[in-house]
A protein has these predicted regions:
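NAD(P)+-binding Rossmann beta1-loop-alpha1 motif at the extreme N-terminus of oxidoreductases
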Residues: 2-64
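Solvent-exposed alpha-helices and their adjacent loops that cap or buttress functional pockets
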Residues: 3-6, 70, 85, 169-172
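Nucleotide donor/acceptor-binding cores
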Residues: 9, 143, 175
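Short beta-strand/turn micro-motifs composed of small residues
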Residues: 15, 38, 96, 122, ...
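Rossmann-like NAD(P)-binding element
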Residues: 66-121
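Rossmann-like NAD(P)(H) cofactor-binding subdomain of soluble oxidoreductases
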Residues: 98-164
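Active-site-lining helix/loop region of Rossmann-like oxidoreductase modules
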Residues: 169-270
Length: 270
């Protein structure tokens, strides 16, 4: 399918945490119309002054081939009304933690329109939940639902004086990402739609590049087609990195403000 119809359509981003807010700013800086949604529970905190300040992308932004996008841009809409966010959008990006997926999809599914493409990142089995709920809720809209194994950046939202700001400190941008759709027959169209997401800029910029490791192995940059959605979820390194780090660092967490005399607010797994 020719996915070029997505070129001039708005992008809706569901979830205004670190990944969602950064992707919103990134896409807006590239000139896209972006609608950013967050649940009423978090919107008051995550949208403080966003209409006045816009979203700023800062940080080192390390990327192997040097791609960066810096500056401040305003989104077209920041709202806790999902219907307003997704109406007429071509691409819907779900950038939320796994425990929020079911609630988000239960709200989203009745609002879906034919031709929309849903990108879930990181997927954390969200594609399975979405398709399962679509069947249960009797949704017959012709949409594409696909998974990415991770987010396109390593980022932190800057906090000042306990206030969540609209500055996104991007430390690095990845140059390769694995993706797949559910069902797999939609994967080619899903991968093609990714070129209309400016937040994947470093990946698009690196498309076709090949680097050689010290062991002589070839590493291909750009978008990589996964075998299945299950493959995508098993490709996520976070469980391998974060679980051992949390378990082995439990004593440090417990004693950060006592034995170590540090401020608990400054604790980081890293």
């Amino acid at each position: 399918m020719d996915m070029s119809y997505l070129k001039d359509m708005p992008i809706a981003i569901l979830g205004a945490g670190g990944v969602g807010k950064t992707m919103a700013g990134d896409c807006a800086l590239a000139g896209k119309e972006v609608r950013l949604w967050d649940s009423p529970r978090f919107a008051k905190m995550n949208f403080v002054n966003i209409e006045k300040t816009g979203i700023t992308l800062s940080g080192n932004q390390f990327s192997y081939f040097g791609f960066q996008r810096r500056g401040t841009a305003k989104v077209a809409l920041a709202t806790d009304d999902m219907a307003k966010a997704v109406k007429g959008a071509g691409i819907i990006i779900v950038a939320a933690v796994a425990i929020a997926h079911e609630d988000i999809f239960r709200q989203l599914i009745p609002l879906l329109e034919d031709g929309q493409v849903i990108h879930i990142l990181p997927d954390n089995c969200g594609t399975f939940i979405c398709r399962k709920l679509m069947r249960e809720m009797g949704c017959t809209k012709k949409v594409i639902v696909g998974a990415w194994y991770t987010a396109p950046y390593g980022i932190r939202i800057v906090r000042r004086g306990g206030v969540v700001t609209n500055e996104c400190k991007v430390e690095d941008r990845i140059t390769t990402i694995r993706g797949c759709a559910l069902p797999d027959c939609d994967t080619d169209d899903f991968m093609a739609s990714a070129y209309y997401i400016p937040a994947f800029g470093a990946i698009i910029d690196a498309e076709g590049e090949v680097t050689i490791s010290k062991k002589g192995e070839e590493f291909h940059h750009g978008f990589v087609r996964g075998n299945t959605v299950l493959d995508i979820n098993l490709s996520n390194v976070n469980p391998v990195i974060h679980v051992p780090g949390a378990v082995l660092g439990a004593a440090v967490m417990q004693n950060f403000d006592t034995v170590l005399g540090k401020n608990k607010a400054d604790y980081s797994l890293y």
